């Protein structure tokens, strides 16, 4: 029987193809303890999984590592899901991990979902029960660890946003068997402080075991029954606990919870100044508009007042007088012109003007004009009219031509 000779590369590739074609090895779920852990700067995670008798090399690439819900550590028991394949260059097989969960965590998730569904059915998550978050709190109660980073973050945010806000801190355990009890006590005590306006329930990030105190059923009811509104800021943005669903407002981090509870003094001052400016402008515009209406009505009233009516009538009378004077003057001028024309015409026909040429007029003693000699026969005396006077003459004789 002839045996084909393979190169090392061919052999490794053959083994790789064989493993890649195996259904079980392509969907492997492996339980073991993490060792030789190395989290590379690229984001890839290299480690080994071991049990009492063996170990296997593992790699988890950045795109999968990003979705992990915990930070892997040496000695941690986990269940890794992935596929077995060969790294051809080294000729070694390894587990390419796509997801990983802490051993025993599955039971916690089951308990979490079971309690979540129970409280949801009881109505603890309904929005109708959410209390309104006060916009301008004066005193904020804080329930958290007195030595944790969460408290430092809340204090820093409060100082930055409004130094006038008072923080009343209730020191509580935030993990461990007694943590839920101290958190419940904190809620009860702060509810008795009359001038506390709002409560922050907070802690920093951690694994599901470390945050488990906030998944307690009694704590959930304490949050639900609180007379004062509660903001939860537990863990990081991706961490959700039971109290987050029950609380009146869930913040992704303790710092974000403080941002919600503590109003920004500078922002408020700017808002007040803006309101003041807008009100001032609005009032000025209203006053300006009303003043225009007032002036308009004033003008109408003045126009219709008895004094103005009399003044206007006087003006009308003056105008009529002026018009009448103009018409009279025009009529007089016209008549004067006519008179002058007629005078000229009369003057032109004045018989006395003939006397200026050397002619005379003869009248009887009754001042009747004599134009025929026959009229003289009955007269003894006549009047002779010259251009510059008259004379009385006696008739001595009458001569006929």
Curated annotation (Swiss-Prot):
GO cellular component: cytoplasm; exodeoxyribonuclease VII complex
EC numbers for this chain: 3.1.11.6
EC category: hydrolase
Catalytic activity: Exonucleolytic cleavage in either 5'- to 3'- or 3'- to 5'-direction to yield nucleoside 5'-phosphates
Record-linked InterPro entries: Exonuc_VII_L (IPR003753), Exonuc_VII_lsu_C (IPR020579), OB-fold_nuc-bd_dom (IPR025824)
GO BP term (any one): DNA catabolic process
Short name of one Pfam family: Exonuc_VII_L
Quaternary structure, from the entry: Heterooligomer composed of large and small subunits.
Family classification: Belongs to the XseA family.
Stated role: Bidirectionally degrades single-stranded DNA into large acid-insoluble oligonucleotides, which are then degraded further into small acid-soluble oligonucleotides.
Protein name per UniProt: Exodeoxyribonuclease 7 large subunit
Organism: Clostridium botulinum (strain Kyoto / Type A2)
